[in-house]
Design a protein with these regions (language model features):
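Conserved nucleotide-binding/hydrolysis micro-motifs of P-loop NTPases
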Residues: 96-100, 270-273, 306-307, 342-345, ...
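Interdomain "pre-motor" coupling segment immediately N-terminal to P-loop NTPase/helicase cores
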Residues: 1-30
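Glycine-rich phosphate-binding loop of nucleotide-binding enzymes
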Residues: 35-115, 348, 393
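Short loop/turn elements that form and flank the Walker-type P-loop nucleotide-binding site
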Residues: 57-59, 85-87, 259-261, 293-296, ...
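Conserved ATP-driven motor cores of ASCE-family P-loop NTPases powering translocation/secretion/packaging/pilus
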Residues: 133-135, 324-402
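Conserved P-loop NTPase motor module
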Residues: 178-179, 195, 389-420
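Hydrophobic residues in beta-strands of the RecA-like P-loop NTPase core, especially within AAA+ ATPase
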Residues: 93, 302, 339-340
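P-loop NTPase motor domains
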Residues: 97, 101-103, 107, 121-324, ...
Length: 420
């Protein structure tokens, strides 16, 4: 942290008492909180243990970033360990399953997405369905909405097949469909491609009934293929389905945020890394959280967040749920704790909301340039040289950047690198 002194310059050696006074003055947070237990030691300061108030780390959100094998996951677990010991509420999203045995059942409630927990179709808005299936025109979105409405009607009446409209009286069918109530939202997603094809109808010239439309069938064919591909070539149906025997993800999240001293762990390792489903589920959770009132404050931890930020359909687009939470969540007591290998994998808007960064080794100039505004000139030069487990903590709540050596906690973590 200190540059080499010049010849004939005065040098002062700080004893342990002076070091402690300096370290206690680094935090600018004036709250009366009790500091968390030490999760690291200071580099170049006789391995003095570091302790911070929770608000110093989280009140402007925390982002841990570093290349693979730089120690960021170990750092994250060390911080989570101290939060759990202090009975702080945590919501954990684990995309790889490496934290699945880190916490006991008494400490956190564990859910396995796609195994014992699903997302009921009733929890998705039409806009979210449109994004998920990459609707590229208003026409496609309207057809999808009509198909979903028809399947909701079928599910309400206990029918396990699509709604055939050809030959049906238009006025009567519209009356039947209007009987759907706000709580009649569940439907069988596996029937969606077939129902979209069944929406290829138009008003017959006589009789006031629906007739098959070749023009609409041709127009809808691409949408049918797209939805069929998503359902048959991904694990989509493992997560989005109506199954009263399994836990509903959003219901579990709502219960968690209103339960004191409770933590929730969600294992999302069954999600495909590049199928877009993960980003949509995170969006759902974020929108669910931001819509709730009287939330008991908690830390929302998402490991490897780059899996959930970028849209799979465009390199320039990002899911906006996390951005919304970063902007508005703090007012409701929701504090983000994110990890990623590359700071460029999150949107610039989201990165701009991160007031505290735990920076591990970064090697690419573009990556370093992204976090350059958070570092002084000396720190920028040191980022490439950090060893595994070493990090620079920079925050709006600290007077100076601090160099840390993270202390590995004793909790089990599946992140060891296999020997070649």
């Amino acid at each position: 942290e200190f540059t080499t002194v010049g010849i004939a310059e005065k040098v002062y050696f700080a004893n342990e008492k002076v070091i402690q006074i300096y370290l206690q003055s680094v935090e600018t947070t004036k709250t009366s909180e009790v500091q968390l237990k030490s999760f690291a030691t200071y580099l170049n300061m006789n391995d003095v243990e570091v302790s911070f108030k929770p608000s110093t780390l989280f009140d402007h959100h925390l982002f841990a970033v570093g290349t693979t094998n730089s120690g960021k996951s170990t750092s994250a677990l060390s911080i989570l360990d101290k939060l759990i010991e202090e009975n702080k509420k945590i919501l954990i999203i684990d995309p790889t399953g490496e934290y699945r045995d880190s916490f006991s059942e008494q400490e956190v409630k564990k859910l396995n997405l796609g195994v014992d927990t699903i997302v009921s179709p009733s929890k998705l808005s039409m806009q979210q369905w449109s994004v998920l299936f990459e609707m590229n025109s208003n026409t496609q979105g309207a057809v999808l909405a009509e198909a979903i409405k028809s399947l909701r009607y079928q599910h309400k009446n206990g029918e396990n097949c699509c709604l055939e409209k050809v030959g049906k009286n238009i006025a009567q069918l519209q009356k039947d469909l209007s009987s759907i109530q706000n709580d009649d939202n569940d439907f069988d997603i596996s029937l969606l491609p077939e129902q979209i094809a069944a929406e290829s109808v138009e008003e017959a010239r006589k009789g006031g009934v629906y007739d098959y439309s070749i023009f609409r069938a041709n127009s809808n064919s691409y949408l049918v293929q797209k939805v069929s591909y998503q359902l048959s070539n991904t694990n989509f149906l493992d997560f989005f389905k109506y199954d009263p025997q399994k836990k509903n993800l959003l219901d579990e999240v709502k219960t968690f945020i209103h339960t004191p001293n409770a933590s929730l762990y969600i294992n999302s390792s069954e999600l495909g890394a590049s199928e877009g489903i993960g980003g949509m589920i995170i969006d759902l959770i974020c929108n669910c959280l931001i819509s709730q009132d009287e939330i008991i404050p908690f830390v929302f931890f998402i490991d490897e967040v780059h899996r959930y930020t970028k849209s799979p359909y465009s390199e320039e687009e990002f899911h906006d749920g996390l951005v919304l939470l970063a902007r508005e969540g703090r007012k409701k007591g929701i504090f983000l704790f994110l990890t990623s290998q590359n700071p460029q994998d999150v949107s610039p808007i989201l990165l701009g909301q991160m007031g505290t960064l735990l920076i591990h080794r970064l090697t690419h100039d573009d990556e370093i340039r992204t976090v350059k505004n958070h570092l002084d000139e000396y720190s920028v030069k040191q980022v490439k040289k950090l060893n595994c487990g070493e990090a620079i903590l920079t925050s709006v709540n600290l007077i100076n950047n601090i160099y840390l050596n993270i202390t590995k906690c004793k909790r089990k973590q599946y992140n060891d690198t296999p020997l070649l």
